[in-house]
Structures are given as C-alpha cells and as structure tokens.
Curated annotation (Swiss-Prot):
Domain Response regulatory positions: 2-150
Protein name listed in UniProt: Detocs response regulatory protein DtcB
Organism: Enterobacter cloacae (strain JD6301)
One annotated GO biological process: defense response to virus
InterPro entries, sorted: CheY-like_superfamily (IPR011006)
Amino acid sequence: MKILIADDNIQKQRVLRTCIEENFGSSDITQTFSFTTTIKALTSSVKFDIILLDMTMPNYDSKEPMNNDGKMRTLAGQDVITKMAYRGITTPTIIVTQFEVFGRHSSLKPISEIAQELIASYPNIVKGYVLFDLQSELWKTDLIKKITEL
C-alpha cells in the first residue's frame, strides 16, 4: 500500500506512520511537510493508494530554497483537495487534524462542517476526517476503521 502522509508536524507524522505499520504491515510511505511539497508529490509519477492529509500546513517546507513564504496556510488541506479535483487525482483522502475549529472570530467553522462540505463536493476523493489527539487512542480506532473501509 502506497500512502502519502502530508503534515508539517514531525511527531504527528511519526505517530501516524507507526499506527499504519502496526495495523497494516509494511507500507510504502511518503511524507510531505507543506502545501507545495504535497502538490509536488501528488503530481509526480507516484500513484498513492491513500492520503492522510493535515488541514493546516505552511506554504513551503522550511528547508526549501527561496522559502520566503513559509506562512501557515490555515486550510491547506482543503486547497490540496481542490487542486487534486482540478487535476483529476481521485486518491482516497482522509483529513487528519488536531483542530476542532478553523477560522477567526465570527467566521469560526468546525472541522465536522468543513469535512462534510468537502465530502459533498468531492465524494470520490474525501473519505472523512479523524480528530487527532496524542492524549487519546480514539483517533487510532477511527483512522484504522476508515482505512479498512476503503
């Protein structure tokens, strides 16, 4: 199974990778840490079976040359999904986020609502979301179930 984990949090990536390896055996896992490197991975010749996608990532990896826009992109995951649809990439994608709400002040929106909108708009791509929490094991059960159902 070829899996792309797109997340800027190294610890979260490590925990996700361990969860996959423990429950699905050895997998070919590619890791990206920004919006740009995620798009590059998706448009490369590699075809992934599953994408685990964080919702908030920087525009560029901090190690990329000419990185003068490493600002956080609050809805990077949503933007990745939109680009996937535009390019005809329909790899099953599970959003894995630590945040329950996105936005600012009066424009706050819960991840459950964002995910439902994405599932409705891109049903061939978005297969749900998992609320990641290092203090709990519930996210693992949810993620394993969602991957198994694919």
